[in-house]
């Protein structure tokens, strides 16, 4: 059968795209409906996806009985480290009096919490895949000249097991994985999918009534917030490198405030206006720290030493010996506050706490103490919305104080939004 050969370049790598669980379900629906209505078992199908690409899909594992037929598609995630890669997505189609009804069966989760794509009680088959499934069912009906209706039940037998390796239970999706995809295509290591997963976590918290948001780039920030600041790690949303986009998403979700707890190695970049802290986007840690030290009277020799520091933690003793550590950190956090407020543009209050694992709190933005008090009260009285979970940020060797996040995407492809690259 013809293979799906569509590639993207990520860094210096050429990676093959795959297709989403939604595309699999739509193709399986076409196969099952065609078998039910005409008796023909199609060996393959070409599915038009919302991305504009047509995907060739092999149809397999046919079965039929009185009034129903079933077909399966084996998920191909391409080069994306997707937990559902290789899983079989089934569609069982039966005749009804009219219309097309779509539901989930074994291995497809059920929504139990507001704020997700589908209402509480519905199968976790998102809007775009539902539309794709309905379109393929109707295409089979037209081709067969059938004027009645069809009921489609999508099942993923491995979904119950796979869901244990995803964030679905934390988001309020129980009993299986989600059928996802907005473009029908899995783009390996897609930044859009990572940002969308963060935005979904924010919407779930907001729907649960959370107004004051706690954010950290990764595990270190989350653990510091809980262990040193007395905050609830269960309410911490991890933004990885996407500080600016997380602010945008928090504003869109309607939060009133947001506190970022992060290492100096991460947040010194934000103080320079770098809102995506991935090392391949920009660095500037040493330059920014050296500039603020110079503003506080650092000598030319000290500035040179700071510029030669490999990590920000290595720079801190130099500033302390020069007697300007506190002043430099105050200058950095003031600039950080300015950049956060500029990005928020008045839509919400954004503050930050800057720390180093070996040095503790290094600085706070102007309004951070007020947000800390609000979040401590929430921690004492509410409990968490969801356990924190790390997110791979692809940071450099330091990212300057060990704020290296390690979200195991290969073991959790159906993450908060869903599959890592499913768009």
Each predicted region: which residue ranges?
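Extended hydrophobic packing segments that form well-structured cores
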Residues: 130, 333-384, 388, 418-423
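A structural signal for small-residue-enriched, beta-sheet-centric alpha/beta enzyme cores
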Residues: 8, 16, 171-177, 182-331, ...
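Generic domain-boundary/flexible-linker signal
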Residues: 113, 163, 224, 269-271, ...
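Surface-exposed flexible segments
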Residues: 88-90, 228-232, 365-371
């Amino acid at each position: 059968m013809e293979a799906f050969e569509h590639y993207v370049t990520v860094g210096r790598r050429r990676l093959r795209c795959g297709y989403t669980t939604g595309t699999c379900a739509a193709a399986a629906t076409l196969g099952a409906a065609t078998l039910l209505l005409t008796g023909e078992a199609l060996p393959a199908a070409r599915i038009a996806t919302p991305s504009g690409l047509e995907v060739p899909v092999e149809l397999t594992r046919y079965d039929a009985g009185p009034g129903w037929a079933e077909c399966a598609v084996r998920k191909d995630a391409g080069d994306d480290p997707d937990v559902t890669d290789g899983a079989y997505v089934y569609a069982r189609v039966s005749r009804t009096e009219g219309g097309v009804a779509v539901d989930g069966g074994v291995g497809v989760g059920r929504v139990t919490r507001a704020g997700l794509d589908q209402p509480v009680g519905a199968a976790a088959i998102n809007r775009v895949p539902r539309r794709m499934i309905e379109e393929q069912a109707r295409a089979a009906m037209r081709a067969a000249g059938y004027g009645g209706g069809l009921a489609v039940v999508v099942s993923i037998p491995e979904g119950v097991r796979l869901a244990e390796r995803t964030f679905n239970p934390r988001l309020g999706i129980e009993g299986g994985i989600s059928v996802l995809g907005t473009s029908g295509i899995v783009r390996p290591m897609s930044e859009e999918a990572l940002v969308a997963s963060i935005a979904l976590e924010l919407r779930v918290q907001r729907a649960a009534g959370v107004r004051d948001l706690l954010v950290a780039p990764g595990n270190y920030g989350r653990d510091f917030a809980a262990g040193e600041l007395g905050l609830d790690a269960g309410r911490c949303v991890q933004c990885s490198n996407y500080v600016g986009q997380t602010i945008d998403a928090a504003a869109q979700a309607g939060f009133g405030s947001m506190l970022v707890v992060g290492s100096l190695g991460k947040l010194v970049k934000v103080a320079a206006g770098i809102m995506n802290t991935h090392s391949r986007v920009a660095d500037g840690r040493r330059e920014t720290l050296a500039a603020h030290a110079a503003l506080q009277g650092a000598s030319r020799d000290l500035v040179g030493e700071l510029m030669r520091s490999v990590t920000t933690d290595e720079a801190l003793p130099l500033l302390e010996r020069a007697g300007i550590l506190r002043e430099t950190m105050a200058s950095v956090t003031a600039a950080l506050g300015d950049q956060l407020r500029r990005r928020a543009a008045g839509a919400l209050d954004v503050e930050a706490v800057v720390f180093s694992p070996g040095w503790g709190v290094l600085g706070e933005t102007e309004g951070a103490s007020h947000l800390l008090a609000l979040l401590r009260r929430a921690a004492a009285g509410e409990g968490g919305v969801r356990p924190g979970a790390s997110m791979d940020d692809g940071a450099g060797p330091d990212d300057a104080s060990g704020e290296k996040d390690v979200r195991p995407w290969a073991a959790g492809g159906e993450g908060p939004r869903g599959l890592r690259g499913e768009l």
